[in-house]
Design a protein with these regions (language model features):
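Charged docking surfaces used in two-component/phosphorelay signaling
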Residues: 16-24
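Short hydrophobic/Thr-rich beta-strand motif most characteristic of the beta2 strand and flanking loop
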Residues: 26-33, 41
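Receiver (REC) domain switch/active-site region of two-component response regulators
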Residues: 106
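Active-site beta3 strand of CheY-like receiver
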Residues: 45-51
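Acidic catalytic/metal-coordinating carboxylates
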Residues: 34-37, 60-66
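Conserved acidic carboxylate
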Residues: 9, 83
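Alpha4 helix (beta4-alpha4-beta5 surface) of REC/receiver domains from two-component response regulators
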Residues: 16, 63, 85-102, 111-112, ...
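Receiver (REC) domain active-site loop signature in two-component systems and cognate sites
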Residues: 56
């Protein structure tokens, strides 16, 4: 069964780009534009992995992950952070991020990071 990835990105063009490539790799993608929407989405359906921007309106990626990781069902979900500012890497790692990719986003790096934590074979099974 295909794995589900939650994409949290406030920039619509970036969100569409990520969705396009993840769908093409065989994943199910749910996309939202901020941390509040992500928290609500995770209550409805627990994703297998989260790809999240750090700097977003309403609730940033760090705040969102801190809240989500406090839930037992979410504590082991891998998180890949995306940001234009690499200074928050240590904070992201403390919150349980498994990868920290900088913008401008290299699609190949994102797909490699996702496949590392959700192998493509599993996504297409």
């Amino acid at each position: 069964m295909p794995k589900t990835i939650l994409v949290v990105e406030d920039d619509a063009d970036m969100r569409a780009l990520i969705n396009h490539h993840l769908l093409g790799a065989g994943y199910i993608v749910r996309a939202v534009s901020n941390g509040l929407e992500a928290a609500a989405s995770c209550l409805a359906v627990t994703p297998d992995l989260i790809v999240s921007d750090v700097h977003m309106p309403r609730m940033n990626g760090f705040e969102m992950i801190a809240i989500l990781k406090s839930e037992p069902a979410m504590e082991r979900i891998p998180v890949i952070f995306l940001t234009a500012d690499a200074k928050g890497r240590r904070r992201g790692n403390k919150l349980g991020a498994v990868e920290y990719l900088t913008k401008p986003l290299k699609v190949d790096a994102l797909l490699e990071a996702v496949a590392k934590h959700l192998p493509v074979e599993d996504a297409r099974a």
